[in-house]
Amino acid sequence: MFYQDPFDVIIIGGGHAGTEAAMAAARMGQQTLLLTHNIDTLGQMSCNPAIGGIGKGHLVKEVDALGGLMAKAIDQAGIQFRILNASKGPAVRATRAQADRVLYRQAVRTALENQPNLMIFQQAVEDLIVENDRVVGAVTQMGLKFRAKAVVLTVGTFLDGKIHIGLDNYSGGRAGDPPSIPLSRRLRELPLRVSRLKTGTPPRIDARTIDFSVLAQQHGDNPMPVFSFMGNASQHPQQVPCYITHTNEKTHDVIRNNLDRSPMYAGVIEGIGPRYCPSIEDKVMRFADRNQHQIFLEPEGLTSNEIYPNGISTSLPFDVQMQIVRSMQGMENAKIVRPGYAIEYDFFDPRDLKPTLESKFIHGLFFAGQINGTTGYEEAAAQGLLAGLNAARLSADKEGWAPARSQAYLGVLVDDLCTLGTKEPYRMFTSRAEYRLMLREDNADLRLTEMGRELGLVDDERWARFNEKLENIERERQRLKSTWVTPSAESADEVNAHLTTPLSREASGEDLLRRPEMTYAQLTSLAAFAPALEDEQAAEQVEIQVKYEGYIARQQDEIEKQLRNENTLLPATLDYRQVSGLSNEVIAKLNDHKPASIGQASRISGVTPVAISILLVWLKKQGMLRRSA
């Protein structure tokens, strides 16, 4: 039977991608249905209890700048906040927070249940309704059919998921949850390229069986960082430390002596695992010269005794996991409460997607999260928001939107996936972005909130706060530009006390702030340049914009040159065999990838600058050279 009401957008899956997709579509005013196999696991942290990190924190800030949920949720659930790379430049600084799993899940569910235009329904999805290469709905486990103009797949590791512990394996979407086998079979019937990937998780330890007295503590930062541009530190719950232990030669011997019982090394697992989050087996074998690896013991929550040992993800048998855990300092008597495991699952080639994350072959079908070959909550959330907003736009007969590489880490993520694809779980790093000085955590709102408002993602409260911040930045910069001090002025001695070389000529507040030894806080503590802005976010922007002005201007010039290629569009139906002068290899790659622009084509491996020149000349001759606005 069909459900009585049609929807504009259906989201399948309630993880980090699905929840952001559902919130985005509903915020834009479209009638949205979120289908999940279990309402109680909405926003579940399946692996590590943390949000953010290098590259990942940037994505969280961008999701927040577009009105998303993740940053707000972690501000309410974070039990330890830190700025990583704090001593480095602003481009690579990143926020990371340990999370209380229960509080995080509660924050997500509360937001979902209070979002207008959003209905949540508990049923596993087993089929899609596809008519004439267009998705028009979904069918649940009990045969209930829902109609919609767009469907977003955010199914994580559930598609034909297989859990491995030692040489034993069984079907599962994650520990304690069933896999989605009928939906996996249905998707394999569609004209989509599918492969297998693998990820893993460590055993969880009972905190009461760990001797923390012999371990080093790691505390959060003070003052506490905040993730959301709308948040404040008073929202954070009680803060707790993490602890550090290490593997040792005994640990490594246990692992080496049991590799024949590892499903990875025994050839039982076919899927490729994450390069940047390897299992402890992989670390010991790949870095054989190292006699220890640092392991962070991270609390899973304020009301839980479970500890997440970050760094020993494993699929070795349970008895070997016990030996590994008990070989480390402080864990000699530790007890495991949940075994570690590896999981294999289906993923679909993201090169078959448009930059909007809509399928090139099934109209109205969007993919987001691990189904696209990524790993990590943050990567999933960012894709979910993009897929959700574009599903909403499609359902309203509007054109899709995707950020450029020069505009957001989300743009880098989507361009990498759709242009290059991936053969292993893709993780975001700042090193993947060529314009990272422009794509900082601190300016995510300046880059994206205006666009979020145009798209209908940003509410009135956030928009008012954003404009107030812009005004504060502009007013303060003008004040510093127009406030001067001369070497002979009474205030010069106070200024010189903060400088490595004294004033030799008249200088404005901005001139002084450009000096590497002068901070905004120091400058505004001087009588001549007081008072400081009360808006800390605006003050941070003033300092960064002034200090890095020259570098930022140079990078902006590079972006404008590159935009010419990015804006030169390629017809989706172009058969590159028509273009004389291209090599067979280039023709094959261009026909396979079907890039949307010259810029995208130039990033395909094997497509040379000469090939790009030939293509541009051919397009001009054919009268097909056109650029987007």
Curated annotation (Swiss-Prot):
Name of a matching Pfam family: GIDA
PROSITE patterns xrefs: GIDA_1, GIDA_2
Intracellular or extracellular location(s): Cytoplasm
GO cellular component: cytosol
Example GO molecular function: flavin adenine dinucleotide binding
Necessary cofactors: FAD
UniProt GO BP: tRNA methylation; tRNA wobble uridine modification
Keywords per UniProt: Cytoplasm, FAD, Flavoprotein, NAD, tRNA processing
Positions with a binding annotation for NAD(+): 273-287
Residues binding FAD, per UniProt: 13-18, 125, 180, 370
Superkingdom in the source lineage: Bacteria
The UniProt record lists the keyword Cell cycle: no
Keyword Flavoprotein part of the UniProt annotation: yes
Family affiliation: Belongs to the MnmG family.
Record text on subunit structure and interactions: Homodimer. Heterotetramer of two MnmE and two MnmG subunits.
HAMAP family: MnmG_GidA (MF_00129)
Function of the molecule: NAD-binding protein involved in the addition of a carboxymethylaminomethyl (cmnm) group at the wobble position (U34) of certain tRNAs, forming tRNA-cmnm(5)s(2)U34.
NCBIfam families: mnmG_gidA
Protein name per Swiss-Prot or TrEMBL: tRNA uridine 5-carboxymethylaminomethyl modification enzyme MnmG
The gene coding this protein: mnmG
